[in-house]
């Protein structure tokens, strides 16, 4: 990975910052994207730090223009709405906002990166989904639907489309389960930890670095050069059922 130019979106967040650090440890030239967390992104020591609202088409286009040619894109940025709301009480405004900040933002990021791949003839895109998109998540149907679309129809379409313009380009995804991060800190109390780890053989919540390591593995042409259209789940073996009382 040494010398590869990598864009990490959402680099001011827990998983995003871990991804940026992991790529830098591999000798990559990292472009760290942020939306609101400029200071946190700036503290990473990345080669370039750029701000953009990924739900706004013009800002995403500017981001890729300023980032320049890229070898890898880790599309990490996303927002998990912390309040549990069942579908019958879910406001349309929240539904649309959650889809914009997760699905639309990932689509615009993927489109920008793959347009560049069409020019350079290569590229590796790693999108970050969620176990919510694999198993569902009661109280967060909006988030689960957005993440399911990313690691389902979007992933499988992109891996087939990109090779028309860049024959060795690859698209994969990582699905984290419960992970310690600023986004989940307020929700992981002792009772929640006990409940969610009952679905995991490893019986622990992930650290951002656990997720970042798998993002780097999928991004690497050496380690994953013949891997595309795949999902790596980083969730301690989580299943959609209880494994212990």
Regions found by a protein language model. Name each.
Residues 23, 162-179, 226-232:
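Conserved Rossmann-fold SDR core element
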Residues 83-87, 91-99, 196:
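Substrate-binding pocket helix/loop in short-chain dehydrogenase/reductase
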Residues 84, 223, 228-245:
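Short C-terminal tail/terminal secondary-structure segment
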Residues 110, 146-147:
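Active-site helix of classical SDR
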Residues 130:
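Residue(s) in the substrate-gating loop at a strand-loop-helix junction
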Residues 200-211:
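A conserved structural motif in NAD(P)-dependent oxidoreductases
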């Amino acid at each position: 990975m040494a010398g590869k130019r990598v864009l990490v979106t959402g680099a001011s967040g827990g998983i995003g910052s871990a991804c940026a650090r992991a790529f830098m440890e591999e000798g990559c030239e990292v472009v760290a994207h942020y939306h609101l967390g400029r200071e946190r992104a700036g503290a990473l020591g990345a080669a370039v730090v750029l701000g953009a609202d990924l739900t706004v088409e013009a800002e995403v286009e500017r981001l890729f223009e300023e980032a320049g040619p890229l070898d890898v894109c880790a599309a990490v940025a996303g927002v998990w709405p912390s309040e549990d709301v069942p579908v019958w009480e879910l406001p349309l405004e929240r539904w649309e906002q959650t889809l914009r900040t997760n699905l639309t933002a990932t689509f615009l990021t993927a489109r920008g990166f793959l347009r560049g791949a069409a020019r350079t003839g290569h590229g590796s895109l790693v999108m970050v989904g969620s176990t919510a998109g694999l198993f569902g998540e009661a109280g967060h149907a909006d988030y689960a639907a957005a993440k399911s679309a990313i690691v389902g129809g979007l992933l499988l379409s992109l891996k087939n489309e990109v090779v028309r313009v860049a024959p060795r380009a690859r698209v994969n995804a990582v699905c984290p389960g419960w992970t310690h991060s600023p986004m989940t800190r307020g929700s992981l109390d002792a009772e929640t930890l006990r409940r969610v780890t009952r679905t995991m053989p490893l019986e622990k919540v992930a650290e951002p670095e656990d997720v970042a390591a798998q993002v780097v593995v999928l991004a690497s042409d050496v380690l994953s050069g013949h891997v595309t259209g795949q999902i790596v789940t980083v969730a301690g073996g989580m299943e959609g059922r209880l494994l212990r009382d």
